[in-house]
């Protein structure tokens, strides 16, 4: 599948996927949008496809009448920068969007993946410097695991995402396929401590507050599930753990919204048939992936998305 803005004309119903924003107190990071850049990217998208508000897109999906060029705007990971920077742009364009929120940080369990991303951006000159330090720490702390991974790394790993460098793909291979969550956390804690900060300090700055989530819903945006703890690979969990990820996520959001969410996006785009079954049992009606790959017999829980990295900003 071609990854480009032009592909929206004929790729089938698609979500535009956004994560990070800078401005209004939030520092610039890799891939982040300013308010102006975000507005221009939506303008570009609306010229080549039919940009719908989330509630309209959702209704058309449920009625099975989405058009080939229908697109919508979506946000993952429940980040405060999305509320502080992007929400006002959406208001100015009279557009509402999907906001998919993982709720672990609200239960005292910080979203480690995003905290580590912010740490990399703020404490390292560039990601390659971080990758080098990560490799060095892993090789020193867990040498057998490191050497084994070097032998088994598939060169085509994640090449479906052309904006990933080889360093990106190697790091994600270590993180998502080789290390256990506890092993990855151990390595990252060592590196963070070496730089004089903590997970808790970073978490305070990035997590979208319950009040902001409630305000988004009041403004007409559609808030949905994104799992509770945002596992890097949710398919590695047991059946009970998979169900818990979404049921707990739903409990938190239902408390904020006074109604149960009916939509979701798959964390890291990862899911399996068991997860789809869990979502159907929870009456989740619409779900989004994180890529543009074709899926045979695609259900409404597997709608494709175009990463914001492919959207022009000028």
Language-model regions, residue ranges each:
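Membrane-embedded segments
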Residues: 82-86
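C-terminal active-site subregion of NodB/CE4 polysaccharide deacetylases
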Residues: 1-74, 81, 116-119, 218, ...
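Short, glycine/acidic-enriched loop or turn micro-motifs at the edges of active sites
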Residues: 79-80, 229
